[in-house]
Amino acid sequence: MKKIIITFSLFVFLVFNSLPVYADGHSLGGGISSSAPFGINAQVCKLNEGKTMEDYHSLNDKFYKWTKKNDVEVTVINQIPFYSHGDFNNPDNYDFVEFLVGPHERVGRTWDTWLKSKDAQKLKQEWEDVATCYVKAASGNFLYANEEALNKIDLRYVEWNWCNIREGRKAEDLMKEHSRIANDMEKNPNGIIGWLTFLPQLGGASYPTFAHLVIYPDVESVLKNKKIEAEGGWKDRRDYETEFAQCNGPLLMQEEILYRPQ
């Protein structure tokens, strides 16, 4: 395990995690359900000098074996920037983000076992030699899920958009609007295979209130969706961001499911 950040009011957490979900099923493996909140341990990481992503992946293979041996398996996800907000004047200050995902209790038990286990100490030292990370805790909740696609596709793309609730609006207002959007998405997903809210809980004081995560199977689906937005769908985004939430603007990450518990 490594290190990260996030915090939010219990009120906002309860409301955003009480939204109905439109899904083809329920199980996403590893104890994760698309119809209930799940725990997320996020590591925002920068490779140390001279280290590569190959070094990172070789360590993860050891980590998967360790979690299986100690009965604390979690889903492991890696994201790297694809269409980021970075440029030459404001470069990205991280190389990748890793997510350990599962039921909240299991993610916590993985941490406890990691911290107490003697056989994890060598692996911990090897990890710290490869990358420097900030560790944060969050909760995820699906609003729309194509279970078959999410369980089958390991390499996909995730659009992030960080938002704050607009002054004068309550979390219940967003809950109602999100439910309406999810209902429309169920009828016509336009290439989207998943939509969830990401709620920082520990270590995220510098982050907005929540993030929308929209999952696509490939870049073609991403840009097909953007074509629809360019042809008039932008009005829906404008209305949402005018009435309900003030958002930073979307970016795209390439996501790979590195490990699914058996």
Feature map (PLM): residue ranges:
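Short S/T/G/P-rich N-terminal loop/turn motif that feeds into the first structured element of a domain
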Residues: Y22-Q262
